[in-house]
Amino acid sequence: MLITLLLTLALQHPAQAMGFDQDKTVHHFPMTANGGSVEVNATDASDEASRSAIRMHLKHIADAFAKGDFSKPLLTHGEMPDGVAELKRLKSSIRYKYEDTAQGGAVRITTSDPDALKAVHAFLKYQAREHHAK
């Protein structure tokens, strides 16, 4: 019951789940031959509050993902994203590296494991679909 309530509240208020207003940001989830990235940028280059909140959120998820903790995406989307079971199982073969960008930040995800790569790509495709990323 409590988990259902928390998920409902998170879905109604995604800014609290992620720490920033999604209407003031743009998400990108590019895939590469060895992984991909989660990129979030403030739409207004002068919006320091959004840039700061984006960076804090992405630093947190880079740390959490490296430990196999995908609770933030669960809270944000109300379901576990595609690929997460494999990302958890193969966490020792995946690297998550946070980087600042001019208008926000990025989590670079890399692996040389073919099964982990499939999981990373499944996760990024799910995120792109959910965030209506272009």
Where in this protein do the model-derived segments appear?
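Sec-dependent signal peptide recognition
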Residues: 1-7
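Intrinsically disordered, low-complexity terminal tails/loops enriched in metal-binding residues
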Residues: 8-134
